[in-house]
């Protein structure tokens, strides 16, 4: 284990002491998780949930979403924003899955080699590394580490990520730093750190539990 991995584990353990071990939420079926994560893009959790619940209220099944008039899907998911983009995208993905698999059952991804499952998901337009990792980790309990904007910002400031590394490159890189059994808790606790303390603007460095392990120098002007 290299020094950077040791540092990542130390940071993880400190966050566990401060925030606790996150409780595993009841996993959504993979198609539900996929749609929910697409809806979450460029919006907050509240708006994502409003759109997801509206979609499930209006349409009894994902097959019904797939076959619905696009304008009706767009209307249902409007709370999530970018509905004119997300609505057709969700329907196209549902159609493509059905054409290839014969149904909307994605449970087969649990048995594929991890990288094959990841590649299968990211073939679809609108499904990037983060969306694929969320489906794999949260729904299928696969060892994938999703990197959102909070995690990308926090790990960059801390010094876990090399300078100029892209968010896409950060996914496999952080998977190599953190042990697989820590992915779920590390993901959620780093997000919490980013939301509550390590803000994009004016991070609350004096109250940061990992400030002694952080490379970031706050601006004083």
Segments predicted by a language model, with ranges:
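Catalytic cores of DNA base-excision repair glycosylases
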Residues: 2-221
């Amino acid at each position: 284990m290299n020094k950077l991995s040791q540092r990542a584990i130390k940071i993880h353990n400190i966050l566990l002491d401060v925030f606790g071990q996150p409780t595993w939420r009841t996993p959504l079926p993979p198609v539900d998780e996929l749609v929910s994560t697409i809806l979450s893009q460029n919006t907050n959790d509240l708006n994502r949930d409003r759109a997801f619940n509206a979609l499930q209220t209006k349409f009894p099944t994902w097959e019904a979403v797939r076959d619905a008039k696009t304008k009706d899907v767009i209307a249902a998911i409007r709370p999530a924003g970018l509905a004119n983009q997300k609505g057709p995208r969700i329907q196209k993905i549902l159609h493509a899955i059905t054409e290839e698999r014969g149904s909307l059952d994605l449970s087969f991804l649990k048995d594929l080699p991890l990288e094959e499952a990841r590649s299968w998901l990211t073939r679809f337009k609108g499904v990037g590394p983060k969306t694929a990792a969320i489906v794999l980790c949260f729904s299928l309990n696969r060892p994938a580490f999703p990197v959102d904007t909070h995690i990308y910002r926090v790990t960059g400031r801390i010094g876990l990520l090399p300078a100029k590394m892209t968010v896409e490159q950060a996914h496999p890189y952080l998977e190599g730093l953190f042990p697989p059994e820590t992915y779920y808790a590390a993901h959620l606790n780093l997000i919490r750190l980013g939301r509550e303390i390590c803000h994009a603007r004016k991070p609350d460095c004096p109250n940061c539990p990992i400030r002694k392990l952080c490379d970031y120098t706050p601006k004083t002007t």
